[in-house]
Amino acid sequence: MKRVMLIFAFAWLAVAGSMACPAAFPQSAPSATQTQSQSTSTPPQAKNSAISAAALAGKRLSFEQMLPALPRRVVSKSGAPGDMVNLLIVGSKEQVADAFQAAGWIQPDKTTQDAIVHAIQETMAHKAYAEMPISQLYLFGRPQDFGFVDGMPIQVVAERNHFRVWRTPWLDSQGHTVWASAGTRDVGIEKDQSGTLTHRIDPNIDTERDYILQTLEDAGKVANTEYLTPADPVRQAVTATGDTYHSDGRILVIYLK
């Protein structure tokens, strides 16, 4: 069975192309100059969002002040709108890493090459491989700073919970770091609009948002929560690969212990 899983993983990685997920936490919020310097290679929608966010870079803001500058959706490298930004996480990089590790989430491999090597090592050690990479999506003009996955190893190719996280350019009113996140659950594999194999997501993305919260609460890592509804909430949309999804439009704010 493990040999079959490994072969399937190789096939999946081959058709999926480059699937990178940077795992390093940035040391500081990007400055307006840094954000603008990325504009030549930034997807169009992300570029517009980065400009509005850059104007507030480094400032302490209430969430009411943040929402107008917070992009509602992430984009693909080509600029196609994708997943909804449905989470804001308040805490240091150490708190984020500790909280999600305690809650059972793992960081996926960063590159296809890493995945192949890791899969071989796990197979030789008679262990299941669960760290398959996730694709790059963009927010604030850059790909995700890191990501987390949660899924049974035997099902992880087709089914898993996962989310991407970006450090925002601003701080909350108390001076704490704020992270924006987009979480969805993969429930199968399908061909996208270009004919490439990709994951199919659960259309009710609120389920994943609330599942992420539940895992953190079960681990005792949540200090407080609140839900925010933007003036222009995302109720229904289509991912960059053509999947439809729906939401109540609320963004969950999680304050970590």
Where are the regions that the model predicts?
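Envelope-exposed proteins and targeting segments
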Residues: 83-85, 103, 161
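Bacterial N-terminal signal peptides
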Residues: 7-20
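Compositionally biased P/S/T/G-rich terminal and signal peptide-adjacent segments
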Residues: 43-78
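Primarily extracytoplasmic ectodomains and periplasmic/lumenal surface modules that are beta-strand-rich
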Residues: 92-109, 114
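Terminal, regulation- and interaction-focused segments at domain boundaries
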Residues: 69-99
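Signal peptide processing junction and immediate N-terminal pro/mature segment
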Residues: 18-35
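A cross-kingdom signal targeting lumenal/periplasmic-facing segments of multi-pass membrane
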Residues: 111-257
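Positively charged n-region of N-terminal signal peptides that target proteins for export
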Residues: 1-4
